[in-house]
Every structure is written in structure tokens, then in C-alpha cells.
């Protein structure tokens, strides 16, 4: 009898185990800090995950009931570095890619990078194995990856974003996707003037329509065969969009249940803070008025920063000589300039450990979502120098909430930067009070990882198909062209 009960228990557990394919090719550390936490949460809930990804972050996890297999797209980091180097031609001061740089031509190289990754021998061998999966999870930032939902049909297709969603993601879900004032396109860098905003929204819509409907479709058919569906057809397969974000940052956008805001901070459960080295601990403790931490994230190639921008930073650091400045920067930069005596540079700092140190009084950063999560966790006021993508919008929201000062990175001077840093330090009590207020708003009803797993399991169990129309979380307007949405009505 006992043996029978054990067998039934094992069978029940096995029935609840899903085989999940996660296609996560973008070689950006901040993205994979989030994806790794999600994959680990799935494995801890006894799901088996096969991850197609670059090698920059190891997803290995031992002694869990679910297995993690990693398929290395090991050309991706090299290709990504080529992409970043090529983008230097249109980046202002070598770092700022504002909305004027967001064009189909500039972003085509990103799609070509994905194509090269999926041509990788490891990926080709995996595709030839004809394995089956219950779900395919892809990055929300690139429609090209949706082809895996077609290749492994009828698996449920899920998109995940390390932060904000794209307008195209919301269109596919049938959510409110576009408004020049209330729900601006996440690629926008300028938010003044309703007429200019509307024109920018229209241009961005057309640029990404060109990227998807023509160029991506052509590459998909070249790579996977003439019968490969179009991007618009592939979007129809998406049943769930997971956003590692609290909706307050997204202006509390109205969305259907197929769009789930996880609350943000998903990566924080994965990254326990380590102790600082003894030398760095001593340097911080000896700082006269405190320490300022400066980091522009993992996606900025500091070697491509223009010398004039480096000099602007150094002039500001000199004026802040009573503070120790910790500056995350590649080794080639300090080797080429004379550093002020109050500046300590390293290629990498344990950011959470630094921000948690009692002497750190300000954080100069690019307004990356994961970095701001860590600053809020540590109650450190921020000075934002946004450089690309969703950073402009996020920096704007942080300033609106009173937890940061935001400057125009393309034109900021040393005097302006010094003044902003001095302001957040001088008004530290007020900034920390507003940080505490924002943290209370961001408080989770459920842990982000728990919520992500719950909804992943739901769309797998209640698999949607045309014979079961009730089994969907999407709206009836999901993925409908605007011309049909506004102009075609059933009679």
C-alpha cells in the first residue's frame, strides 16, 4: 500500500512538470540577471528548462527537482560587441542613443545578430533534435525570437521583459499600447510638446513596422524556410507577457490579464550582497564626507565614450574632492587619463554591497531599472544620466517621484552634474523619505518570482486553442491592425 501511494505521488508530481524552452539570446548582463532568476524559480517548482543563451551568465542550479540545460549561442557576445562598436557612429558623446537614433536601419544589425546566433552550431544541433516542449519563453524585446513558437508548435508562447514592454508587445496583447502623453513609446527620449510627441510616436510606429513587416520577415524566410509565418502571424501565438516592473512606473497602464506586471526587483532574490574587499571597505570608511558611486551599467562600452565626456566627469569629481568617488569603468580609461586622488576605479564593483555601505551618499547612474531597484533597496538618492532605450522614461519617472535628479546626458556640463550631486546629498533626508514612500508603493503582494511561475503554469495548463475560446487571457482586440480596429465593424 505504501509503495502504491509513493508511486501515485511521483506520477502526480511528474504530471505537473513542464518542459520549457527559454530563448534568451540578447547578451546583456542586466537582462540575464532577471532571466536567470525566472529560470531558477521554474526549476525550483520542478519544471525542466532548456535555455538558449549566451555564455556571459551561468544558469546552472544544483539539487532542485527541475533540470536546467543551457544551449550556448556562443557567438553572441562577439556579435553584440560589433553591434555596440558600430552604434558608436550615431551615439552622442559616444554614449547617448536618443530617439532620433531609433530607426529600422540602425536596429537591423540587432536582428542580424539574432540570425547569426540561431545559425550557431549549438543551436542548429538543438533544432535538429526535434524535441517537444510545453511552453516557449522568448524575450519581449525582439519579435524575431517568436519563430521558436512556430518551430516548437503547439507549445504555449510567453514573452518576458527585464523591465518595460514595447508598444508592439502591448498591441499583440490587446492592451492600451500608444499615447504620446500618457503612454509614450518606450524609445522616446523627449517628452515636451504634444505635437512633437505625436509625430515621434507616428515615426516610431512606422520604423518598427518596417523592421517587422519587411526586413525581419525576409530574414525569417531565408533562415527557416518560405513557409515561415510573418511576424504579425507569430505574434498571434503569444499568450502571456511578463514584465519585471511595477505598473506605477508605466503610468498604471490598463492591460488585460495576459499582461502581468511582476512588481520589479525579480533579480534581487538572486543576488545576495557580498562583503566588500578589506581595502575598499577601509577606503570608504576613511572618506571625509562620504562616497559617491558612479556606474553606467553593463551595456555601455566605456571605451567608446568620447574624451570630452570623460573629461566632464573628471572635472566634476575634482570639484567633489571631499567625497570618495567609486567609478565603474574599463581599465583602458584610467590608463589614458590622470585620475583625481579621490577617485577609485574598477572594472566591476559588487553594486549592492557598495550601495548598502553606510558611507555611500549618492549614486550617479544611467537610470537602468535593475540599478534603480538596488538604489531604492539601499535608500540611496540618484542622479540620472540616461543614455538609451527605456532609461529616458525611467529617469523621468524617478525624478517625478522625487527620488532622483535627471540631467540631459547629451549636453550636461561638469558644473551641472556637480550641482545635481550636491543637491541630492544636501537634501538627503527628504530624498530618503520619498524613497521610503515609493518603496511602500512598490511593496509586493506576492514575490515577483512566485507570480511569474504562477502565470506561466496557468497558461501551460489552460492551453488556448480555437476549439476552446474561453482558455485565453487576451482581449478580442489582440494583435489587430489599427486600420481594422478603428474602421471595420461587424454589421
Curated annotation (Swiss-Prot):
Role noted for this protein = Catalyzes the transfer of glucose from UDP-glucose to ecdysteroids which are insect molting hormones. Expression of egt interferes with normal insect development and block molting.
Please list which residues make up the signal peptide: 1-17
Record-given protein name: Ecdysteroid UDP-glucosyltransferase
Q: Which family does it belong to?
A: Belongs to the UDP-glycosyltransferase family.
User: Which residue spans traverse the membrane?
Assistant: none
Give the keywords, sorted: Glycosyltransferase, Signal, Transferase
Q: Which residues, by range, are in coiled-coil regions?
A: none
Species whose genome carries this gene: Choristoneura fumiferana nuclear polyhedrosis virus
What gene does the UniProt entry assign to this protein?
Answer: EGT
In terms of InterPro entries, this protein maps to:
Ecdysteroid_UDP-Glc_Trfase, UDP-glycosyltransferase, UDP_glucos_trans, UDP_glycos_trans_CS
Q: Which Pfam families match?
A: UDPGT
Give its E.C. classification number: 2.4.1.-
Gene Ontology molecular functions = UDP-glycosyltransferase activity
Q: Which Gene3D superfamilies match?
A: Glycogen Phosphorylase B
Amino acid at each position: 500500500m505504501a509503495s502504491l501511494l509513493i508511486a501515485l505521488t511521483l506520477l502526480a508530481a511528474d504530471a505537473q512538470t513542464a518542459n520549457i524552452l527559454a530563448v534568451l539570446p540578447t547578451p546583456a548582463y542586466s537582462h540575464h540577471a532577471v532571466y536567470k532568476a525566472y529560470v531558477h524559480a521554474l526549476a525550483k517548482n520542478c519544471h525542466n528548462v532548456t535555455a538558449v543563451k549566451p555564455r556571459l551568465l551561468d544558469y546552472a542550479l544544483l539539487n532542485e527537482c527541475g533540470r536546467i540545460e543551457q544551449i550556448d549561442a556562443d557567438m553572441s557576445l562577439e556579435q553584440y560587441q560589433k553591434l555596440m562598436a558600430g552604434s558608436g557612429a550615431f551615439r552622442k558623446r559616444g554614449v547617448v542613443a536618443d530617439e532620433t537614433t531609433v530607426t529600422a536601419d540602425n536596429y537591423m544589425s540587432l536582428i542580424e545578430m539574432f540570425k547569426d546566433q540561431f545559425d550557431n552550431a549549438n543551436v542548429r544541433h538543438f533544432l535538429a533534435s526535434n524535441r517537444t516542449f510545453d511552453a516557449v519563453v522568448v524575450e519581449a524585446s525582439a519579435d524575431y525570437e517568436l519563430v521558436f513558437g512556430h518551430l516548437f508548435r503547439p507549445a504555449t508562447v510567453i514573452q518576458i521583459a527585464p523591465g518595460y514592454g514595447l508598444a508592439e508587445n502591448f498591441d499583440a496583447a490587446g492592451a492600451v499600447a500608444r499615447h504620446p502623453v500618457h503612454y509614450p513609446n518606450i524609445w522616446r527620449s523627449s517628452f515636451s510638446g504634444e505635437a512633437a510627441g505625436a509625430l515621434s510616436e507616428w515615426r516610431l510606429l512606422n520604423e518598427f513596422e518596417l523592421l517587422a513587416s519587411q526586413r525581419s520577415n525576409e530574414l525569417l524566410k531565408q533562415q527557416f524556410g518560405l513557409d515561415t509565418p510573418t511576424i504579425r502571424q507569430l505574434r498571434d501565438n503569444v499568450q502571456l507577457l511578463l514584465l519585471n516592473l511595477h505598473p506605477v512606473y508605466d503610468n498604471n497602464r490598463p492591460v488585460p490579464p495576459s499582461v502581468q506586471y511582476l512588481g520589479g526587483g525579480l533579480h534581487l532574490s538572486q543576488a545576495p550582497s557580498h562583503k566588500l574587499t578589506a581595502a575598499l571597505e577601509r577606503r570608504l570608511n576613511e572618506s571625509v564626507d562620504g562616497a559617491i558611486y558612479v556606474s553606467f551599467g553593463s551595456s555601455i562600452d566605456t571605451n567608446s565614450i568620447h574624451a570630452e565626456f570623460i573629461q566632464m566627469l573628471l572635472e566634476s569629481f575634482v570639484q567633489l574632492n571631499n567625497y570618495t568617488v567609486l567609478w565603474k569603468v574599463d581599465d583602458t580609461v584610467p590608463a589614458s587619463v590622470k585620475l583625481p586622488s579621490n577617485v577609485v576605479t574598477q572594472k566591476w564593483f559588487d553594486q549592492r554591497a557598495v550601495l548598502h555601505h553606510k558611507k555611500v551618499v549618492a549614486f550617479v547612474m544611467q537610470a537602468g531599472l535593475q540599478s534603480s531597484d538596488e538604489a531604492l533597496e539601499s535608500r540611496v538618492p540618484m542622479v540620472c544620466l540616461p543614455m538609451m532605450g527605456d532609461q529616458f522614461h525611467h529617469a523621468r519617472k524617478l525624478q517625478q517621484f522625487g527620488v532622483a535628479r535627471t540631467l540631459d546626458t547629451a549636453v550636461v556640463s561638469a558644473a551641472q552634474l556637480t550641482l545635481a550631486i550636491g543637491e541630492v546629498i544636501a537634501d538627503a533626508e527628504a530624498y530618503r523619505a520619498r524613497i521610503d514612500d515609493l518603496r511602500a508603493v512598490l511593496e509586493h503582494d506576492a514575490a515577483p518570482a512566485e507570480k511569474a511561475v504562477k502565470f506561466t503554469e496557468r497558461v501551460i495548463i489552460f492551453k488556448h486553442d480555437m476549439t476552446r475560446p474561453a482558455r485565453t487571457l487576451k482581449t478580442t482586440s489582440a494583435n489587430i491592425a489599427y486600420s481594422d480596429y478603428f474602421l471595420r465593424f461587424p454589421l
